[in-house]
Amino acid sequence: MHALIIINRAGSLIFQREFGSSPTALTPNEYLVLAGTIHGVHAISTQISPLPGSSGIQLLEAGTFNMHILQTHTGMKFVLFTEKKTTNARLQLQKFYELYSDYVLKNPFYTLEMPIKCQLFDEQLKRYIDSH
């Protein structure tokens, strides 16, 4: 895994975490632009799909990495950047959504749609990443 970003239903970046060290790490501003771009392209892809009820882009394959997208029923997008050989990204995205539900949404001090600043979420995310 390279990075995880969470985009709220309005298209704003509310969480970003890189895993390991990467010489091509993005700046915070670049992550904001990336989140807005992903949100827009995802929305357009649902409209231009020839099949009604399309859920939009779920996987984008690039030359050196893959971008996996999980859109929740509430419109949140969990975006995971992985190596090409990663096979269980969908399960990982489900787990990240589960951690988000357990440690962010159940936090009485968290305001929906706002940037995620939750220590328990960070700790559980790190624990999961370290174990995989």
Swiss-Prot record:
GO-annotated biological processes: endoplasmic reticulum to Golgi vesicle-mediated transport; intra-Golgi vesicle-mediated transport; intracellular protein transport; macroautophagy
Gene3D superfamilies documented for this protein: 3.30.450.70
Physiological role: TRAPP plays a key role in the late stages of endoplasmic reticulum to Golgi traffic.
Record key words, sorted: Cytoplasm, Endoplasmic reticulum, ER-Golgi transport, Golgi apparatus, Nucleus, Transport
PANTHER family the record matches: TRAFFICKING PROTEIN PARTICLE COMPLEX SUBUNIT, TRAFFICKING PROTEIN PARTICLE COMPLEX SUBUNIT 4
CDD domains: TRAPPC4_synbindin
Location relative to the cell: Golgi apparatus, cis-Golgi network; Endoplasmic reticulum; Cytoplasm; Nucleus
InterPro entries recorded: Longin-like_dom_sf, TRAPPC
Lineage: Eukaryota, Fungi, Dikarya, Ascomycota, Taphrinomycotina
The name this protein goes by in its record: Transport protein particle subunit trs23
One GO location term (cellular component): TRAPPIII protein complex
Assembly mode: Part of the multisubunit TRAPP (transport protein particle) complex composed of bet3, bet5, trs20, trs23, trs31, trs33, trs65, trs85, trs120 and trs130.
